[in-house]
Regions:
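N-terminal basic, low-complexity leaders that serve as flexible interaction/assembly modules and, when applicable
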Residues: 1-31, 168, 242, 249-250, ...
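Active-site loop segments of alpha/beta catalytic cores
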Residues: 58-257
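Short, conserved acidic/polar surface loops in the N-terminal third of protein domains
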Residues: 21-25, 40, 90-95
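A short acidic, glycine/proline-enriched capping/turn motif at secondary-structure boundaries
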Residues: 16-19, 34, 44, 86-88
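A gly/proline- and charged-residue-enriched helix-loop-helix capping module
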Residues: 32-72
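Short, flexible active-site-proximal loops enriched in glycine and acidic residues
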Residues: 9, 37-39, 78
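A charged helix-plus-loop insertion that forms the helical arch/lid used to bind
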Residues: 27-43, 99-107
Length: 257
């Protein structure tokens, strides 16, 4: 499909939960439920066992996949590697997998055991840096951080429990790989766009709740904007999809693009 449709880039298709799986939580996918960990975290002892697990060699298969994809892609087609953000991974880890209650368990830890939550976020940050470093070394031309559940955090808590760690990851990768673009996507994060841009990322991803023109103004000339067509648009017929895409493109002037 990459060659057939001439996409601007290819992205490594992988689950963001490869990191907690490598940390010993034994990821499984249950029909009718979704992702579930066979070794969930219930207390401090469980947490300490998980954060002390070395994961690098357990994720070699992802590096091999990146290398194989890069070798088979056209040289002019960039490959985007990615990882989940520390906060988003913590949501799944402390929730035992998927959630139908907006990850109430991690939010409970946030207010009752913040020190333990921070301990987990710090460890995840280091694991993510190593994971993305491996992808870059194996051929990823850009990387993207997905904070799929950042929007669950309050206005005051997002900078503490998500943004702080996103910035740590971007800063370290900028030091080691200054020419590799780094994109940050926070679902429901429109209110924090200015702060996200200040992580010194190369681009921001925005969802359909954010005005594209406003986002571009916040991003400025040195930060790209990715998004923001509502995926549900694809449920419409072909003419409707074309109309919505054109509307999106026409919302920016040539200079703004």
């Amino acid at each position: 499909p990459i060659e057939r449709y001439g996409f601007d880039a290819a992205i490594l298709f992988s689950d963001i939960l490869t990191i907690p799986d490598a940390m010993g939580m034994e990821l499984d996918f249950v029909e009718g439920y979704g992702p579930k960990f066979n070794n969930p975290i219930d207390d401090k002892n469980d947490l300490l066992c998980v954060i002390e697990t070395e994961i690098e060699t357990k994720l070699d298969y992802v590096g091999s996949a990146v290398k194989l994809i890069r070798e088979n892609l056209h040289k002019n087609t960039p490959l985007i590697g990615f990882a989940g953000s520390p906060w988003t991974l913590a949501c799944y880890i402390l929730g035992g997998g998927g959630s139908k209650d907006d990850f109430i368990q991690v939010r409970k830890w946030l207010y009752t055991q913040p020190d333990l939550l921070i301990l987990l976020l710090e460890r995840l940050t280091e694991n993510i840096i190593n994971y993305l470093t491996m992808q870059i070394k194996e051929g990823a031309d850009a990387i993207m951080l997905f904070d799929s559940w950042g929007g669950l955090l309050s206005y005051l808590n997002f900078p503490i429990y998500s943004l702080h760690y996103l910035k740590k990851i971007i800063t370290r990768l900028n030091q080691n790989f200054p020419t590799i673009p780094k994109i940050v996507f926070v679902k429901g994060g429109g209110v924090w766009l200015e702060s996200i841009v200040q992580t010194d990322c190369s681009g921001i991803g925005i969802d359909w709740t954010v005005d594209l023109k406003s986002a571009k103004k916040i991003a400025g000339k040195n930060c790209a904007v990715q998004g923001n067509l509502d995926p549900a648009v694809l449920l419409g017929d072909r003419s409707f999809v074309r109309k919505e895409v054109k509307k999106l493109l026409d919302s920016l002037t040539e200079e703004e693009r």
